Amino acid sequence: MNDKDIFTSSIYEALTSFEIKGLAFRDFFNAADTTSRCASLHLLFPESRAWQQDEALEVEYDFNALFVGPATLLAPPYASVYLDEEPLLMGATTLSVREFLQSIGLFVTEENSVPDDHISYEMELAVMLSAHARHSPQYHDALTRFVLGHLELWLPAFITKINDCAKTSAMKCLASQLTNWFDELKTRVIL
């Protein structure tokens, strides 16, 4: 996602611990390899050293089964799978997210490579809107629309699928923490 380098080093310093945790979730779902994924898990769960050493391979298998494939995904990380009548990638929901991004001057830098409604992009958007909402009613309104009109409609079902299908304690803990994070996000929107 890009808004002329909206997350420069100075804004990272201004992020709350809540927002930093949101970016750690983004990084976990966007990680390209086991090492990066384990690093994200360690940020989310400092006590996860054991997972890094003992369960790293199992977590990787679990991650792939849940979110990547090659078999049918157990917990697809795309909003369109949960919201569209036909659970397809790059469907109406993806285009709706793209339009929402454009309406606030943002876009996904790898458009058509990874669908705009991938959980990692949506986590980043929620964090960006949250960070800016502290200073701008315009961003608070956008955050409210995004959370209540979009995330709330699919993220709980996604988390339930993770809980129901995960094989490792790391993934089950991730689902629990994502639930807590999302509950706090909704509280911030309502206030």
Language-model features: locations:
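Surface/interface-facing alpha-helical segments and adjacent flexible terminal/loop regions used
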Residues: 1-191
